[in-house]
A protein has these predicted regions:
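Amphipathic alpha-helical transducer elements in NTP-driven molecular machines
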Residues: 34, 48-51, 64-70, 84-98, ...
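Conserved G1/Walker A P-loop phosphate-binding module
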Residues: 1-84, 88-111
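Short, glycine/charged-enriched secondary-structure capping and boundary segments
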Residues: 21, 83-86, 115-118, 216-220, ...
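Short, intrinsically disordered, mixed-charge
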Residues: 23, 56, 92, 96, ...
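Conserved Switch II/interswitch segment of TRAFAC-class P-loop GTPases
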Residues: 42-47, 74-84, 95-156, 170-183, ...
Length: 363
């Protein structure tokens, strides 16, 4: 399951956004599995209209969406890398996530105090990035110290230390671990450290309701920072998300349209996260259930089958495949088969976004 950590300075709207996302997901997907793990962590169902359309087509008894766990990570202040505030707890929590959603205040409001006295997206981003970088630098230095003796006789330790030396140089220059070009083997050496600046980052520009559709100068300022870092950005409004909670689901689309946007913050954030991490969705559908499955882009049909069960991958023979839109156009699997639209794909097939698949296997 994808796990995203939501970080940000105090009073940027981080917790408001988290609470709204989790509450909206629960309201939007009342018939989907949902749970709150603890007050600062919630598993939400990924909104996907294709899932409901396929379930209707198949008269499915159950709908099972993919899920994302959002973690509201508290305690990040200047000096967190030295344990200030809830720094140590913050760092332990964030090391476990797949991606970091960095909420940055991009709205003016005299009633909401800014910790630095004024709104400054680039400055705020730098504060958090500095803390992440300092925490990583400390961890890399400690690891290299432990490797000293091993590196005298172990080629593996020498290889790891060589990678860490390059990462340390980047961190000392104020950069991020993700900026260091690594081979697949070298990346595996780094993975156990859970370096914070190696994780993909999305900047969520938290704007007022009036700026949700078009953004503002603060958004442009942060977009320039993100471009320089190779990070993603998504515009979001904690204020709007909180208002959505109070509306009946049937009225939400009209409310968002009135603001000039087509989707709420949860959809925008998940879409951006999937794109950043290179994730794809495929479906299985039938009378028993219609289900969405998350895979990495580039996965072959057997690998995608293995996400369901390892036996499916081990004994893979072929996959009956059709695109979601084509299946919906046909009206049923039987009609699609009669039209010759169902494809038998083999072991080399790369699964496409939105494929509907049925696997034939033998173990």
């Amino acid at each position: 399951m994808l796990k995203a950590g939501i970080v940000g300075l105090p009073n940027v709207g981080k917790s408001t956004l988290f609470n709204a996302l989790v509450a909206n997901a629960q309201a939007e997907a009342a018939n989907y599995p949902f749970c709150t793990i603890e007050p600062n962590s919630g598993i939400v169902s990924v909104p996907d209209p294709r899932l409901n359309q396929l379930a209707t087509l198949s008269s499915s008894k159950e709908i099972i969406p993919t899920k994302v766990e959002f973690v509201d990570i508290a305690g990040l202040v200047k000096g967190a890398s030295q344990g200030e505030g809830l720094g140590n707890k913050f760092l332990a929590n964030i090391r476990e996530v797949d991606a970091i959603v960095h909420v940055v205040r991009c709205f003016e409001n005299d009633d909401v105090i800014h910790v630095s006295g004024s709104v400054g997206p680039a400055r705020d981003a730098e504060v958090i990035n500095l803390e992440l970088g300092l925490a990583d630098l400390s961890q890399v230095e400690k690891r290299r110290e432990r490797l000293k003796k091993q590196a005298r006789t172990s080629k593996e330790a020498q290889a790891e230390d060589g990678v860490l030396e390059r990462v340390q140089a980047e961190l000392e220059a104020g950069g991020a671990a993700r900026n260091v070009a690594l081979s697949a083997e070298e990346a595996l050496l780094l993975k156990p450290l859970g370096l914070l600046t190696a994780k993909p980052i999305i900047y969520a520009t938290n704007v007022s309701e009036d700026d949700l559709a078009g953004g503002n100068a603060y958004c442009q300022e942060l977009a320039a920072v993100a471009k320089q870092e190779g990070a993603a950005t998504v515009r979001i409004s904690a204020q709007v998300e909180a208002e959505l909670i109070e509306l009946p689901e049937a009225d939400r689309a009209e409310f968002l349209a009135g603001l000039g946007v087509e989707e709420g913050g949860l959809q925008s954030l998940i879409r951006a996260t999937y794109a950043l991490l290179g994730l794809r969705t495929y479906f299985t559908t039938g009378e028993k259930e219609t289900r969405a499955w998350t895979i990495q882009a580039g996965m072959t049909a057997p690998q995608a089958a293995g996400v369901i069960h390892t036996d499916f991958e081990r004994g893979f023979i072929r996959a009956q495949t059709i695109g979601t839109q084509q299946l919906l156009e046909a009206g049923s699997l039987a009609a699609a088969r009669n039209k010759g639209w169902l494809r038998a794909e083999g072991k080399e097939y790369i699964v496409a976004e939105g494929d509907v698949m049925e696997f034939l296997f033998n173990v």
